[in-house]
Every structure is written in C-alpha cells, then in structure tokens.
C-alpha cells in the first residue's frame, strides 16, 4: 500500500550557487558515504549528483508529509547507487519500502519518492 509520494524539481544553477557560497552545504546534505561517492565525480556530473541527492531527500520528506526539519533531516536519508547504477534508499526513518527515481536535464533535476508499506516481504 502506498503511504506517500513526493516530487521535487530543482534548478541546477541554483544548487551550484549554493555549493559555491556555502561550503558546508555538502556536509549538511550528504551523509559520509554519499560524500565519498560525490568526491569521485567532477564538473557537471558532481553538480548533478549533489542536486539529485538534495532533491531526492526533499521528495522523501514530502512523501513522509513532514518536509525537511526536526522530524526528517538530510542525514536521516542515505541514497546510494546499486551495482547497476540505480539509486536506492539505503537508510531512512520510514518503516517500509522507499522507491526513488532521479532524472536530469542540462538545467534541472527531477526526483520522485514513493513510500510503500505492507509489502516489505516482496
């Protein structure tokens, strides 16, 4: 059963400006494991990565119905790629399954998270 769904669209230039002006942004948004993944990237791909993770975590918080804040923080959610390169929510406060999709164009990133409960044995 679907518990919640969240969608976010983020402008890449906006994220680039934030990263350039606020170096702590990376530490705030990315978990230590995600920062290791980020440091392997450069240029446009690095920007897409940080924007994608930020947007996906925003989508997750919307699916929870809380937004990012006291109930759910960026550090509560960890998204890593599986062996095939698909993003997977590895750590999260929701007790069910979290599905994530991240898509990019040259200028924006769009993410969707669906939280599912009751089919954990699938």
UniProtKB/Swiss-Prot annotation:
Catalytic EC class: transferase
GO molecular function, one term: magnesium ion binding
Family per similarity comment: Belongs to the P-Pant transferase superfamily. AcpS family.
Cofactor annotation: Mg(2+)
SUPFAM superfamilies per record: 4'-phosphopantetheinyl transferase
Protein name: Holo-[acyl-carrier-protein] synthase
Function in brief: Transfers the 4'-phosphopantetheine moiety from coenzyme A to a Ser of acyl-carrier-protein.
Keywords assigned by UniProt, alphabetized: Cytoplasm, Fatty acid biosynthesis, Fatty acid metabolism, Lipid biosynthesis, Lipid metabolism, Magnesium, Metal-binding, Transferase
Main location: cytoplasm
Gene behind this protein: acpS
Annotated compartments: Cytoplasm
GO biological process, one term: fatty acid biosynthetic process
Lineage of origin: Bacteria, Bacillati, Bacillota, Bacilli, Lactobacillales
InterPro entries, per database record: 4-PPantetheinyl_Trfase_dom, 4-PPantetheinyl_Trfase_dom_sf, ACPS, Ppantetheine-prot_Trfase_dom
Protein residues bound to Mg(2+): 8, 58
């Amino acid at each position: 059963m679907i518990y919640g769904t969240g969608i976010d669209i983020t402008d890449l230039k906006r994220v680039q400006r934030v990263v350039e002006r606020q170096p702590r942004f990376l530490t705030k948004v990315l978990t230590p494991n995600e920062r290791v993944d980020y440091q392997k990237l450069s240029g446009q791909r690095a920007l897409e990565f940080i924007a994608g993770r930020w947007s996906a975590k925003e989508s997750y918080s919307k699916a929870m119905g809380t937004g990012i804040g006291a109930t759910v923080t960026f550090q509560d959610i960890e998204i890593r790629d599986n062996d095939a390169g698909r993003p997977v929510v590895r750590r999260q406060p929701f007790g069910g399954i979290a599905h994530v999709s991240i898509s990019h164009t040259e200028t924006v990133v769009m993410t969707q998270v669906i939280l599912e409960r009751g089919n954990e044995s699938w």
